[in-house]
């Protein structure tokens, strides 16, 4: 029995050494250590041996099995390492080959305009305020002097979630929230960019989701002339030197007086063209002096503090700057459109 075990060990180690791949190695493992292998047969036949020989033969059988197992593991590790080296050699990179150019992403034209507007006002000392897109009825309407029953609160114009919760219809709620945080003490000087939602039918000039940038300044002795000077500077930096603006009377519930703001046409220099519809002026935003009711509801004394506010649609400004005739282009992810705005 001893001789047989020694011979099995010799044969197994020889075949392990000759194995050229993992499959051949596994065949050796099954042949010698499997349930039907010779080592297992020896252990099963221990009962036929004289009692005094069983411990010695059992110990030898376990020793042989352990030696074969260790040889199998060592050979497997060697074969796996050789396989890794073969793959590395096959996949070697030729460092002398020219590199492939990396395609860089570019800002979306709308994002570019929003960032440009933000940078202009930050340069004037404004800070950027942010707020929730899912807003309460109070901040979206009441705090902005839009009482119950006002047409702008109609269910047909807003996306209501509950009777008191809706998707904000403008970024003005951020102004009300910011003024509240100041607890009646100025100055306040912010811009509020963000997405807004209205129940509009999507067409060339309307979208159910779009962006707004609103601005607010509250302090002592703020006048209409401050508003005009700010917006004239904004127009000149955004549309080019030589631009002028004009105010036209209008109405917004949260400002009094309220104005529509036009900029002199940057296409025809005021001579009249298709962009300005022959008038020499292009409407770009709405503005006005903050209504005393809005100041009071936010905790400011309207006899001590005054302020101005303005709001614009970056989509409209981007359409004017780049000659885009359909707002839907901004949201369709058409690469033919977007690639026209690649930065060099």
Swiss-Prot record:
Record text on cofactor binding: Binds 2 magnesium ions per tetramer.
Name of this chain's protein: Phenylalanine--tRNA ligase alpha subunit
Enzyme Commission designation: 6.1.1.20
GO terms under cellular component: cytoplasm
Family note: Belongs to the class-II aminoacyl-tRNA synthetase family. Phe-tRNA synthetase alpha subunit type 1 subfamily.
Keywords: Aminoacyl-tRNA synthetase, ATP-binding, Cytoplasm, Ligase, Magnesium, Metal-binding, Nucleotide-binding, Protein biosynthesis
Gene: pheS
InterPro entries xrefs: aa-tRNA-synth_II, aa-tRNA-synth_II/BPL/LPL, Phe-tRNA-synth_IIc_asu, Phe-tRNA_ligase_II_N, Phe_tRNA_ligase_alpha1_bac, Phenylalanyl-tRNA_Synthase, tRNA-bd_arm
Cited Gene3D superfamilies: Bira Bifunctional Protein, Domain 2 (3.30.930.10)
Pfam family, one: Phe_tRNA-synt_N
Keyword set includes Magnesium: yes
Single biological process term from Gene Ontology: phenylalanyl-tRNA aminoacylation
Essential cofactor(s): Mg(2+)
The keyword Signal belongs to this UniProt entry's keyword annotation: no
Cystine pairings recorded for this chain: none
Subunit architecture: Tetramer of two alpha and two beta subunits.
């Amino acid at each position: 029995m001893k001789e047989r075990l020694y011979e099995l060990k010799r044969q197994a180690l020889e075949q392990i050494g000759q194995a050229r791949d993992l499959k051949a190695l596994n065949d050796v493992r099954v042949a010698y250590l499997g349930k039907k292998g010779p080592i297992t047969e020896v252990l099963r036949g221990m009962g036929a041996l004289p009692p005094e020989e069983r411990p010695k033969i059992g110990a030898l059988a376990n020793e042989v099995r352990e030696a074969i197992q260790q040889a199998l593991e060592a050979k497997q590790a060697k074969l796996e390492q050789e396989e890794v080296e073969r793959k590395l050699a096959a996949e070697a990179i030729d460092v002398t080959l020219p590199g492939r150019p990396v395609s860089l992403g570019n800002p979306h034209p709308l994002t570019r305009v929003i960032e440009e507007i933000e940078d202009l006002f930050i340069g004037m000392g404004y800070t950027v305020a942010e707020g929730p897109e899912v807003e309460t009825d109070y901040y979206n309407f009441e705090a902005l002097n839009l009482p119950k029953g006002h047409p702008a609160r109609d269910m047909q114009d807003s996306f209501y979630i509950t009777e008191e919760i809706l998707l904000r219809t403008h970024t003005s709620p951020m102004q009300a929230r910011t003024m509240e945080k100041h607890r009646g003490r100025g100055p306040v000087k912010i811009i509020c960019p963000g997405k807004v939602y209205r129940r509009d039918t999507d067409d060339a000039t309307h979208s159910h989701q779009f962006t707004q940038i609103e601005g607010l300044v509250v302090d002592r002795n703020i006048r209409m002339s401050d508003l005009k000077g700010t917006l004239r500077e904004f127009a000149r930096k955004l549309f080019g030197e030589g631009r002028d603006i004009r105010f036209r009377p209008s109405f917004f519930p949260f400002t009094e007086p309220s104005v529509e703001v036009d900029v002199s046409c940057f296409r025809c220099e005021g001579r009249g063209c298709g962009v300005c519809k022959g008038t020499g002026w292009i409407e770009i935003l709405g503005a006005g002096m903050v209504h005393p009711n809005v100041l009071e509801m936010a905790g400011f004394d309207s006899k001590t503090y005054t302020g101005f506010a303005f709001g614009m649609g970056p989509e409209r400004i981007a359409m004017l700057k780049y000659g885009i005739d359909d707002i839907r282009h901004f949201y369709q992810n058409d690469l033919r459109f977007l690639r026209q705005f690649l930065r060099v």
